[in-house]
Amino acid sequence: MTAAPVAPVAPAAPAAPATPMTPAAAARQAEAFPRLTPAQIARIDPRGRHRTVPAGEVLGEAGEPVTKIFVVVSGRLDLVGPPRWLGEDVPSFSEGMFTGERSILAGGRFLARIQAGTPCEVIEVAREALLDLIRTDPELSDIFLRAFILRRLQLIDQNLGDVLLLGSNHCQGSLHIREFLTRNGHPYKFVDLDTDADSQAMLDQFHVQAGDIPVVICRGTIVLRNPTIQQVADCLGLNPTIDRTAVYDLVIIGAGPAGLGAAVYAASEGLNVVMIEGNAPGGQAGTSSRIENYLGFPLGISGQELAGRAYDQAQKFGAKILIARKVARLDCSTKPYRVQCSAATGEPLLTRAIIIASGVEYRRLAVENLSRFDGAGVYYAATRMEAQLCADEEIAVVGGANSAGQAAMFLAETAKRVHMLIRGDGLASTMSRYLISRIEAHPKVKLHTRTEIVGLEGNGHLEQIAWRTGRSGPVEKQKIRHVFTMTGAEPSTKWLAGCLALDDKGFIKTGAALTTDDLAAAKWPLRRPPHLLETSLPGVLAVGDVRSGSTKRVASAVGEGSIAVATVHQILAE
């Protein structure tokens, strides 16, 4: 990967008049860009400082850390940036309106320049004061959070923002970066060099070649050639600044449902919390197209949307969340415990308690050349992005659990046919009944029992698969270019390096599951036995899918996360 500056793109002209909206769209726009009442502004006033701003003054530059928002008392503020990033109908902020979007919650970076379009009087509200206001004023909290989230959703829906991704639908790296940006809810524009008429002009403009892809252009000035997701996260400023001299109350490892549940409850109860996630919020559940048996969502909710809401909620209460950071090592020899991230520089994080919610990963197909097709025909998530890649084609879904069933039903909406491959004799022991009924009734889904993939073929992209039914059955070849594998569960515990007691499958043992021999081997130092979710190391808990004996469901994981926080309070009081 290399990074190099290029010449900035000229600023956009002031916004063109908006096209007529439907009543529903107008109502949504009013929520995204509300006008505060005098009484509401009066409650904000003591938390900020008044500034008189001349026309043309820049209040925030694209790429700078978002440390404040501005409430307009008089005059007008404009968003200014490259047309390719912002589009044509760019809103301005007039009297009673305020700047900002979802980036302010995480301490990210400005997606565009904020500049005074006319002489203005504004109230400048620092990020910490804003977050305190959100935590203490329910009415203003609803207004700010709804506006920030809706503004971000508009950018995503319109493929606008501060990221341009040049790549190909047949490129593994392109898909991985698209998945990372999509699951983290970061707006971007994707240019498929195989189909876009202006692709050569794009390559020339940024001085890159087709062999460099995927290429990420951050903020119109920084070019990343074939970057890792950690490098993309750093360029976009997705992570807050962490004080590595502080001793935190709690470090949570993993931002799946269990980790997010723990973060929300811990932060809302006043604990100083840092959460570390290797990819994107949601974990394995975040790749589910629709979860229909989660309490309170009768119409269902996608795993990504559920995770995104919890992510915002945890930050609302003050949790600091590190994205694209994997934990390399847990130093369990001294207290406070030390948590070292593989992609981090400097000192490890110091903490009095740890909740491990690192989850599980799908088992990889036992096929020799699998790595050639990862992201080029073999996928581990079923979201709208993957569905677009295989519209009107025959596809295969491997696995018999709920995640595989949800994927099959979702993909059947756009695919020509879905072949569901399972090694067992049926779905009854591994899948919820409501999903089984839908799969059996769907005309485009065909279930193949006692069947497994034994071969993958293709040149650059998957073109054909081979499967076998039964141990001694014949091998059949099928012209299938897309395989979704959602089978088995490998616990993410290799990084623990013997620090904790594990079961024979690598899951973390807790509470009553810990034997006398386990505690003796770990040299358990306390008179009391381990708490319900506590591991063989005092003050270190495990929750969710990574815990031995846990129920592998989203609701169970969230519940364990909240229970663990109650235990953390007891541990901190010892």
Residue ranges and their predicted role:
Residues 244-281, 366, 372-374, 380-433, ...:
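Rossmann-like dinucleotide/flavin-binding elements
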Residues 160, 165, 169-197, 206, ...:
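Beta1-alpha1 glycine-rich phosphate/pyrophosphate-binding loop at the start
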Residues 32, 38, 49-119:
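Cyclic nucleotide-binding regulatory domains
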Residues 195-253, 268-269, 286-287, 321-393, ...:
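FAD-binding core/adjacent interface of flavoenzyme oxidoreductases
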Residues 307-351, 356-358, 412-527, 570-574:
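A Rossmann-like FAD-binding core segment of flavoenzymes
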Residues 2-57, 94, 103-105, 131, ...:
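Cyclic nucleotide-binding regulatory module and flanking cytosolic helices
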Residues 120-125:
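A short hydrophobic beta-strand segment most commonly corresponding to one strand
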Residues 40-43, 109-111, 115, 128-162:
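A small-molecule sensor/coupling module
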